[in-house]
């Protein structure tokens, strides 16, 4: 019978004797895990909400919207209030606060405070959730270019949009 003449491999936290074959198999699995971690697509996300008023003027006269029936939404043509909920996800390139999410959230909130002056209520005119997301993306991509961004905007956390903007 042939004896295994392979010298033992000693490594901290592993069995005192590990055959070369087992050692190499384990090391390959460990390296594969590291490669998967390095290839992972990383992102952070933040949430915030703002009170706002908007309207959908077409809802007053468009027969597909002002139906007079159970599906009538003509009331949307008049200015109405919502709490707009935002969830913003942005790509990061490493695992140690590439973008610090508390600072990112504060910056996003300040965008609305600066654009609306001292008013606590956003005046959004005819803007849809999709339009709001597109405007927000324009600001984010200027400050943090070359990253994917995903933005969700909802009315009263009930209905809304989700838009994914690939790396630019």
Task: Name what the model sees in each region.
Residues 2-3, 10-168:
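Charge-rich, low-complexity N-terminal segments
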């Amino acid at each position: 019978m042939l004896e295994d003449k392979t010298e033992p491999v000693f490594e901290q936290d592993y069995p005192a004797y590990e055959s070369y074959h087992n050692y190499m198999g384990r090391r390959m699995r460990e390296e594969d895990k590291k490669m998967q971690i390095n290839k992972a697509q990383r992102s952070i996300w933040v949430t915030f909400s703002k009170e706002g008023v908007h309207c959908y003027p077409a809802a007053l006269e468009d027969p597909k919207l002002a139906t007079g029936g159970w599906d009538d939404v003509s009331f949307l043509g008049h200015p109405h209030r919502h709490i707009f909920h935002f969830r913003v996800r942005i790509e990061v390139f490493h695992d140690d606060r590439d973008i610090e999410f508390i600072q990112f959230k504060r910056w996003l909130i300040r965008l609305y405070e600066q654009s609306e002056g001292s008013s606590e209520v956003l005046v959004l005119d005819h803007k849809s959730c999709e339009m709001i997301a597109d405007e927000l993306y324009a600001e984010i991509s200027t400050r943090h270019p070359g990253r994917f961004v995903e933005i969700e905007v909802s009315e009263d956390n009930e209905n809304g949009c989700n838009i994914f903007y690939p790396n630019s």
